[in-house]
Amino acid sequence: MGEFKFQLVTLLKKNSLLKGKSKIKFIGEILAPMIVIGILFGLLYLSAIIQPDFSPRYASGFTEVVGRLKKLLVATNGPLVPYQQTIVNNLRKQIKLAHPDYTNEYIDQCFEIFQDFESMQGYFLDPENYRGVMGGLWFDENDYRYNAPKVLKYSISVDADYTNDNNIQISPRSDSQIYLRHYFTQIQTAVDQAIFMAQNVEIPMVVTGQRFPNPYIHLWQTWTDGRNMILKETGGIFITAAIFVGLFTTITNMVMEKESKILEAMKIMGLHSLPYYVSIAISSCYTIIPSTIIVIVVLKGSQLIWTTQWYILTIILILFSISLILLAFILSKFFNRSKFAGLVCFLIVLIMAGIGIAVNHINVSTTVKLIFCLLSPVAISLANYSMSMKDLELVKIVNPDWSIIVSENQVIGMLILDVVLYAALVWYIDNIISGEFGQSKPFYFFLTKSYWCKKNANENDLVDLSKAIESPLYLRKKDLDYNNSQDFELNEIHSSKATIQIRKLRKEFKTGDGKRVAVDDLSIDMYQDRIHCFLGPNGSGKSTTIGMLTGLITCTRGSALINGLDINQNIDLIRKNIGVVLQQDIIWDNLTVLEHLIFYAQLKGYSNLKEAKTEAKKMGIEVGLELKLHNKAGTLSGGQKRKLCLGIAFIGPNSNILFLDEVSSGLDPLSRSEVQDFIISKKKGKTIILSTHYMDEADLLGDTISIIAHGKLKCNGSPLFLKNRFGVGYLLTITKKSTEFNKDSVMEITNKYIKQAHILSDAGTELSIRLPMESLPMFSQYFKHLEDCKNQLLIDSYGISISTLEEVFLKIGQETLKSTPNFNDPAVKEALSTKSSGVKVGQQLKGLLIKRICTTKKDFKSFMFSIVVPLIILALGLVMYKNMRTIETFNDVTTPLTFSIDDYGDNIYVPWSISGQNQAIDLRIKNSIGKSNHSKLLPADELEDYLTLNYEGNPGAFAFGKTIIEDIEMLSFKVYYNRDYLHALPIYINFVDNLMLSNLGGVGIQTTSRPFQHIKSKFELATEKINFSAIIFFIILTLAAFALVVASHAGNIAQERAARIKRLLYISGLKKYVYWLSNLIWDYVLTFIMVIFLAVVVVIIDSKFRNQFPLFICALVLFVTAIIPLSYLFSYCWSSHGKATGFIFGIHFGIGLLMTVTCFILRIWVIKDDNDILQTITDIIDLVFFFFSPFYCFSKVMVIISNFPGTTRLGESYIANYWGIKFGLPPVCFLALHTLVWTIWIMVLDYYPELRGKYRKGRNEKSSPPPPSDEDSDVSHERSKVLSFETSNDPIIMRDFFKLYKGKGKAKDNLAVYNTSLSIPKGQTFGLLGLNGAGKSTTLGCLSGEVIPSGGEIFVNGFNIQTQRLDALRSVGFCHQYNSLIGLLSAREQIRLYCRIKGIEESKIQETVEAFIKMMDLGSIGNSNVAGYSGGNKRKVALSVAIVGNPSVCFLDEVSAGVDPVVARFMWNVITELKKDKVIILTTHSMLECSAVCDRLTIMKSGKMMCLGSIQHIKDKFGSGYSIDVKFKKEYLLSGINLFQKELPNAKLVDHHDLSASFELPNSLDSPIQLSKIFSIIERNLKPILNDYSVGQTSIDHIFLKLTNLNQQKIKNQQKESIENHIIDINNNNNNNNNNSYLKNHKKTTSNNSILTNNSTTKNFGSSNFLDLESDNTYLNNLKYLEDDDFNIEMPPYQNSLKKSF
């Protein structure tokens, strides 16, 4: 538990740092949920602010309407009978009384009399009449003529839509105020008053109608409409989106950590899955908690959710948030690439929430619904529905069946179950699905004993071979299955512990060609305190073996014990002691170096933060990053990143097993030297497994060397054993002076003295000859002859060494690999000489289109997501558009309805009151109303309170009072009506009038509503055949589908840019517009699948789109052509496919949706309000939206074609011309404009460097800085030649060129390349050497056009790279350091593509491709995707891409970085063969490579050229005779240097690593030293103390070290570290040593040597004297020297205590 807590805290700190470093992203994660909730709240708020009118409105007022505005139609069956005529006349009297100025003739015109209902309705339905009609009065019976019947029946007719549905009595929130608004009650009260007059009952009344006092006076009640229409249905989706949107980045980052191996690297170094997931969950809460709080505050604080308690809602949302986090973990496990992970997971979760909406409405038991709740988004939708229904039930809006509704408590139970289930699934899936990396357990792992009963590591678990010779795990000859067991050094007893024991380890991979064995039954032991080096060709199985040992890869068969624990069963325990450096950097770009080291220090065991910081700083200094501790890792160079990874591996108190996989790959000599020193200094107490391609590094560091090929162990032993076994003597290395060098002449002289001599290799400018050991006595004569004939034989220099590991490797490699390309093959010769026939646009376009076809075909998942998923979304939209039920927005029910209070039941009581101010009237009213059994008299001042409290079940009430109008006192009669009762208002008017007239006049009144047929309004006519919802959903889903597909296309562009594929294509001669044209064409083709599908289906299913097909297809095509280039532009904002796709989709869809919904709302308002001003404003808004979004342009066209309400102009009933200026033409024109603008913009953006270069030429150019005063004479001479135009015909010319990077903010400017003038003639290979940051890559970038120079001129092939970039790069090849290969193409497809890019004739492409495949020995893998190639094979493909087409200039950036010596020599031969007719510029960190292939070179430092010339010239100028490299025997580690300098007094120590040392032996002209004499001294006097040595002219390595200031201070530091780390070991060795004779003979001499005295001009640190000094005082003086000198060494404790005791 303690370890869990500690790892958790450490991870949380790291996560917090990462979030803190990405403030903008973090703010976006916080704002995104707020925006989602803001949209929900906005919709709800709009519904809440539209509240009904609770003020009284006149129900009478007939006389104010009729005549002045409207006519009243009157009809009966036949002519009006007298009594009916009396009623009509009384209506006329009412008008006359109200308007005395009206003439009788005018009043007569206010009425139209008909003799049947049909005639009256026909008049009303006439479009010319209906606007002037108030309504109709129909007398049902005409069998009475003079006397009134007992019940006078009449019907009122108005437009059916001006009444409520006569078939329904009660409907929540429907309201009967409609009868007030459309003159029904005005007619009713006037006719009733006319009947009163006919019966001589004179009671003038003013009737008003008023809704019941608002019972929903509380905040929670004001949301009722929004709750019912929005929250109840879609609330679950909004809540899910708001919370899960914060997990989008979490999922993407998790998958990216898995994809980049960071996660597995952390696990390898001891991280457990549980704290990792818990830390991610807690870190997710940084965004989830605010999101959840916002949701709770909005829902509960605003009282959207009322009935449900705070704590219930909080529990539900907390559980739901936890479940979403766990669900995100589950979903992320199914993605190995971050490409679409975040977006797909987001869509999946939203779909789950959408399923919840459907589950709410299906009529099944709660048990079934609870099963659906196993998906937590479904559960939140059900919970939201239940909570909303409870609130709606309180206001009687719904009457739910609770037996089929899941309750909140049930949801809480299911969410708890979900959390537990999801947590178990995370645990289970994490174990059985490892993804691309890591070990997968069997599906039944939890049933195995080994999983639950872990074995603990202890001392007894370690196999001590000194006591267990017969152990089954002990490696003996009988354990070896190899044919040549003599190639294996078997140590029967070893003093160290066997910490790693590998037995029969095997790994098989499934490939398209069947199974491929990567590691073939490997068995080997590795020991503590030793460095075990894995060597082998690329793809030999080294990294796979390390992967299996660290748990990164699952074993197919076999096993290994690490510290006594089985890797197949106890990998988690093993990892507690492991440190690892993978080939891929396991760092976060936004964390600093110090933050990385602190994090890993704490992760690996330093619980105290202060202690972790101290160790982190110490480690940062030890790996050479003391000046970069506070720099972000993303700003470090490649070498510095490797150093950081090295520090990460070694930091921690328990990192005792170290796996270093090509740790020094790509490092410059300085960095590599520092790394080697560091590894040596840390060896004690550790087992280090190192894989490398540097043989000198393996020789220097390795205690044991294992060489693997094709997964098999070829040999194993100490470096000395392997050299003796495979070297068989000495290696003579001759450097050729020119191409005329004749190796046969050299061999003739050699064989004259040494018969058994033979050529080992002939690569580039180096010839290696094997000299047998027994020929040693002939060396003096042989070298004397060789020296005499040196110039004649065209020998530049030569050196001799005892067999090297490189030789061993080459010898073994020759058995398994091809190391020399067959240049004599006619096909190869033809391929190498095949030149471009001229760049052809059509050919380039063809090549790029084939590339896109191949990558699309091979990346099926991406195709599914980018095309198939959008097609599904599109199909869903079409299905909804076709099948969604049309909802009528008007009432067309004409069924008559007779109003009666009895419709509300026999037990209904009508509350009423009377003011009591006129006793006579009050009495008459009481007598009339009191007769009813339904009435209930209340005090006037209590009525409204009563209605408020008794809202439910009361259809209506009324109150009598008085009012004064124009000094006339009149009876006031107010009807209160309940909103939920559709016809309450006319019913209660009829109820009162009927009772009063029955009591006072003896006649009853029966009023009936007999609606006219509905006359559709403009809006209704516009929507008559339109399905609102269908159109809206169709358009939204269409926008989503196209947004998704173009976002995916943009992701591909972002990926190619980030991988530098686009740059390589441009440098190779691709015309930029062809690149964009090819992408546009292919993306158009893919997108037009959707276009065709949409066009065909929509035309088939919908006549409107069929009729306007030209407009629709034109808009659709232009829409696609506009959004793709716009998406390309957006892609520049992101460097990963996944983030580009997700964010671009969000931008497109979000903006398009927002603008489209705004359009819907505005257009509906325009037509409903019939508002010309609003229409003009909306037109302007349209134009603004057209300008900003092509998505809105297309949605507008769809809106127009679908005849969405408001698309027609006011006053028009249809669209006469869909292409009109107010309709389809503007959006189509804007779409065309978008297409043009965005396409041109991406071109301009890409052509900007050329345009800028042409503009800057001669304008505002910065003057080059003056040449340095101490400039080398050769560099100065070259400058003079270039400036005097003596080299104007050379292919490469740099004239006063420099590059200045401007510092941002307070950062200083960085002059990356100083004033440089250089020319390179044809046929020359030019080497650029220098430390990281010296300016090599910047120089190469400027030469290739990637980087714009700050000043000066650069000419390539005679063209200015700034102003004539395309011409300059027409015949240029580039091999980038980062390969820049297309992973989904095979080697053949890759080379074929660049053949077309470079303009090779189509008829020659196939043979050229096959020739390159043959030359590069790629035949067996030529059809496999490059992504699966080893590093060496990738470099072969990259080199092929660079040289295909026989370019005149080749830039090779670290061409052999990370490849084994066999492949490296292979490449050197290729380069040597190619350079005959071209310029090759090579950057490299390999001095051996430079010596082998370069004709001329420069060493750069701080942007300046420190030297210039051929290798021999630089050796002659900066070298000083001979260089001697030696490797001492272990017992002479400290004394060897002094002993060596004793025999060769003039030898200067140049470099020192552990047992190895490099000396420089000056060779003055006065007394030159012969090579034969040097050999004689070494063989005679120094041989007993040496394991190995080599002698030669001063190497370029030594000169490099000298010119880059790798000087004496470094030597002192190296010696200091050697003393600290080896003094104990050597003392132990010395105690066990019998003092060999050589040491005895020299002891007196060495003891008299002062530690401060040296024959060399440099103060030498006499570490060797520690063993030879005879007195303790001398030893302590040495300690004092160490302490007082400028080394500032922190002495080991035992030394300090010893010193104090004296």
Swiss-Prot record:
InterPro entries (alphabetical): AAA+_ATPase, ABC2_TM, ABC_transporter-like_ATP-bd, ABC_transporter-like_CS, ABCA, P-loop_NTPase
Gene Ontology molecular-function annotations: ABC-type transporter activity; ATP binding; ATP hydrolysis activity; ATPase-coupled transmembrane transporter activity; lipid transporter activity
Keywords: ATP-binding, Membrane, Nucleotide-binding, Repeat, Transmembrane, Transmembrane helix, Transport
Binding site for ATP 1: 536-543
Region (Disordered), start-end ranges: 1257-1276
Assigned GO CC terms: intracellular membrane-bounded organelle; membrane
Membrane topology designation: Multi-pass membrane protein
GO biological process terms on file: lipid transport; sorocarp morphogenesis
Gene3D superfamilies: P-loop containing nucleotide triphosphate hydrolases (3.40.50.300)
The keyword Flavoprotein is assigned to this record: no
Keyword Transmembrane attached: yes
Annotated compartments: Membrane
Segments forming domain ABC transporter: 500-735, 1292-1527
Residues that coordinate or bind ATP 2: 1330-1337
Transmembrane intervals: 30-50, 236-256, 278-298, 311-331, 340-360, 362-382, 412-432, 860-880, 985-1005, 1026-1046, 1081-1101, 1109-1129, 1142-1162, 1180-1200, 1225-1245
Primary localization: membrane
Family: Belongs to the ABC transporter superfamily. ABCA family.
Name under which the protein is recorded: ABC transporter A family member 3
Organism field: Dictyostelium discoideum (Social amoeba)
